[in-house]
């Protein structure tokens, strides 16, 4: 039993009754679990963790695009790859979960960086950036310009900046108005085209909307 006076408990009981979390049986004058409590319990038991839901969406992204889909989160100045769905194509991106690459030269990283302030960006990186290929952005000023384009487009792009012959289109996954992860489609150069990139953006945006709706309904849970 609750160790509290009846005068303190009754307002709570009235509120829970009004909202159908409990109800009183007229014959016994005892309170029972109401339909709202039952609904909450069913929703909890049927929920998927955020990661499970995102992985389901990643399967769909790969099925629609025929390309590799990856999920990443920020780890200081790096993007940490936490999930991947391989392309069914014989020639595809070779990468692995657990790998880390710099935020500044990856599509996933730029999607995560795009809505940070210039001050935050400058605190993360030196003026001159390490080049991984001849196409890698070379300076922090160039990065800031690219992030402005990312904000205008609503998605990030990266063309052969970490691996030659590999291109990436990415969107952020936002919760409470801040990016908490990013989702990408990776496409080999010999398969990419303007129409292919446009298709990838559409697929990613539709997945982004579903995932962010899930976040709003259930919160963010990357648990097991």
Residue ranges: model-predicted function:
Residues 32-127:
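Amphipathic alpha-helical effector-binding/dimerization core
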Residues 26, 35, 75, 175, ...:
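A cytosolic small-molecule/anion-sensing beta-strand core signal
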Residues 135-210:
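Extended hydrophobic
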Residues 1, 53-64, 153, 210, ...:
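Amphipathic alpha-helical regulatory segments at dimerization interfaces
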Residues 22-24, 71-72, 173:
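A structural signal for short hydrophobic beta-strand segments in well-ordered beta-sheet cores
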Residues 132:
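Conserved acidic, metal-coordinating active-site core of Asp-based
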Residues 120-125, 208-224:
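Cysteine/selenocysteine-centered motifs that mediate thiol-based redox chemistry or coordinate metal-sulfur cofactors
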Residues 1-52, 213:
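N-terminal helix-turn-helix
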């Amino acid at each position: 039993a609750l160790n509290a006076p009846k005068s303190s408990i009754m307002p709570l009981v009235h509120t829970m009754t009004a909202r159908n979390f409990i109800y009183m049986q007229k014959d016994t004058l005892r309170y029972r679990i109401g339909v709202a409590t039952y609904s909450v319990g069913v929703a909890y038991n049927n929920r998927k963790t955020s990661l499970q839901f995102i992985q389901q969406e990643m399967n769909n992204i790969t099925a629609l695009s025929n390309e590799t889909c990856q999920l990443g989160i920020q780890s200081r100045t790096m993007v940490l790859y936490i999930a991947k769905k391989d392309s069914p194509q014989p020639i595809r991106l070779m990468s692995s979960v657990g790998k880390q690459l710099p935020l500044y030269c990856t599509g996933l990283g730029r999607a995560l960086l795009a809505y940070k302030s210039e001050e935050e960006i400058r605190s993360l990186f030196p003026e001159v950036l390490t080049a991984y290929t001849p196409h890698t952005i070379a300076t922090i000023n160039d990065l800031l310009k690219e992030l402005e384009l990312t904000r205008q487009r609503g998605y990030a792009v990266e063309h052969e900046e970490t691996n030659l012959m590999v291109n990436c289109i990415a969107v952020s996954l936002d919760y409470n108005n801040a990016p908490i992860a990013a989702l990408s489609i990776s496409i080999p150069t010999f398969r990419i085209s303007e129409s292919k990139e446009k298709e990838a953006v559409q697929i990613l945006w539709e997945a982004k909307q579903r995932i962010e709706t899930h976040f709003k309904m259930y919160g963010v849970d990357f648990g097991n």
